[in-house]
């Protein structure tokens, strides 16, 4: 228990330190020139834009032009820097002790690219879907994945065993986000000549309740575990994590 408390305290301190390093005291107003917004848009030196949302329980990031929202984990370094990692343990952002921000992405993920705030951005909010709309999205996604893979792949969702205390809207949002992320991951694998063979034996995707959020393949079925208690973005594995599972057969639980 002491170890858990220590880890949680360190992460909370990291988030507090990040805000102080970069922005001083956060404000929801963009009219105060001495403070930066708690939800901010950044652009890297090479022109890659993204939004960092610190208004939630955990930091969230979305790249411009991408629908996926990534939940990050903040880890303080010995030199006072704070590194944000994704759910496969890779660094995505670094806040330096001098107040700078470095983005690790794409061709520059090893050396990083300095980024600057360009202004305030709206906080991330999940789409409001009904259960019927969720099933329609699943049907559309199943067609897209099957077409990309050149064979039928069913997408199923089982939400029967989820804690009754969790709002139905939260559950639907989580399943909808997971369907979208999983679909994008499989289509991306299928688009790569050197990896699409990994989908040859895949015939089904099952979305189920489980902790921690993870993914694995069993007898041609991609099983994606979702944790509604972590919300719409933290409760499912990212597209990158799912791609790694499909291509290697292994799930990296570095963060979870």
Describe the predicted segments one by one.
Residues 71-72, 103-132, 224-236, 247, ...:
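Lipid interaction determinants
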Residues 1-4:
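Bacterial N-terminal signal peptides
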Residues 140-256:
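A eukaryote-biased signal for long
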Residues 115, 120-159:
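Charged, amphipathic alpha-helical linkers/stalks
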Residues 8-12:
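Sec/Tat signal peptide C-region and signal peptidase I cleavage site
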Residues 14-116:
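N-terminal Sec/ER secretory leader and immediately downstream segment
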